[in-house]
């Protein structure tokens, strides 16, 4: 079973979502032989908990849940626990928040990532349900019903959080490469003359001023549009030099200073996009973080947030693999935005609220705050292969579920996914998604 530390950690997170403005130290949770007793003031409520056999069955995806209405009463959510009282909201919440299943699974895809197919959210069909947050809303309802004079819910204002991984700084690097891209890829492969015409227009602008490259201008547009909408976008930049592994642009590119000046003006948050190899090599992520800080020094920035390239987060316990928690901590990262499934949009962590990650190895809470990734552009059209209409419907559905539980809708849209064949997705999916 889960430890007392894990129980307290999970209960505190549920309380933060249920009663965001309430002092959680007012509560005390007591672990009983067959359940939990939550004490507050002179009152208390009891909840059941799984035994060891039920916990193992849950982790294997073999537990049969019962169902209740969700907070918005638009569907149903599963409850797990003892058969006679399946209302253990703490044990399964710990599994989702801590990514417990990932710590003990050596099954990975070609990029060393934990797969959606092996996840509990897949086994219990929860990928589109912020189940932990739904449980927090149940806790809120029960506490308010128990002591209405003590608890008056003060809902948290949900947020839309646009994020942008700058995998590619520019589309055009030379005349030869530009013409090859236009007449090779666009004309011969896409065979869409509208795209070819658009590319030629972009090429002519680039020829007159290389800062007019469409990928650079996409960054500028993101910052201006999203700041004007009252949002706080986060931009993740690689910190590599030409010739290093995974380099697609050199951080010393003079155009980046102009980009960062604009982001500084528009109050965009700048983070580190950890290179592919930084998930495997000791000290590399810290080196990249220090390098990015050097180039941002004139803006008084200190980079403390990151997202790994290819969403390469490793939590599996093994002496041969570096642990992402250690890499982030050693690099001075306080906020991570990596945890989402590349192959499926939704709620990998069971929540859309920022929360501190838990170190299962050492049975303690960390000081690294996770901002779960809910939607990624490439997931919609590369992995799930959705049409614009279906991608918009899924994105809006997930956004609404974040709003229903007062969480953060974190969406990733790359700066190279705004033009050509991606333009319909950008205009038809992304722009409606960030509409307040």
PLM region spans:
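Conserved acidic functional residues
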Residues: 165-167, 273, 334-338
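Metal-dependent polysaccharide deacetylase catalytic core of the NodB/CE4 family, i.e.
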Residues: 168, 172, 194-195, 220-319, ...
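Catalytic domains of cell-wall/extracellular-matrix polysaccharide-remodeling enzymes
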Residues: 11, 19, 33, 277-365, ...
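Terminal accessory/targeting
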Residues: 1-250, 341-344, 353, 360-436
